[in-house]
């Protein structure tokens, strides 16, 4: 059983997936930020690999990626940083990024390196389903890496079922068709999540894009197994770079009873 499957079997609700950008705020902050997120109560982590042209990312995450790239972050550097992270970080960790840098590194080489350090899965929003089916899915399975597809409010029911069947670990429900970090219409979000809930999907559903505080996290968790917080946390780090204090305060507020 994968770490992700184990998590979702143990915790049926209110799963908090926290996003952080590799190499941000400093080049060597990566594992420290991950450690602090785990210690503050994150159930799993989504580690963003910075890329110069991130289609799905809003301005806050784009700015953090630009800073990380300026700091010198590369895929090779990231795998070096992650060599021993499993000695102290036990929650599931998925890498989130884009195909271009992964293909430049070599797709199978990338999967082998990710599996070797203890990564659990990948999110690559610009990997089309047909390419996953014909070429890349088999490589991911070879290295026991979960792969998470994204669905949006505009995705048809038939396509949602296809993406759910192909996904393993969880299904990423994008709250709106805009980029990360925008504001969300809570009534529209509830309607969309109720629709997903009624489909009785194979995978647990986590909601992302616009989840930023206790209110939006609680709303998402009414209809899904959990949610992903990204831009709001990166913004908090940007405003107060004391990683331990900022992380503790941020998660305390989100997870408050």
Model features per residue range: what roles?
Residues 1-8, 27, 52-61, 70-83, ...:
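Active-site-adjacent beta->alpha loops and helix N-cap segments on the catalytic face
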Residues 41, 114-121, 140-147, 165-172, ...:
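Glycine-enriched alpha-helix->loop->beta-strand junction motifs that scaffold or abut catalytic
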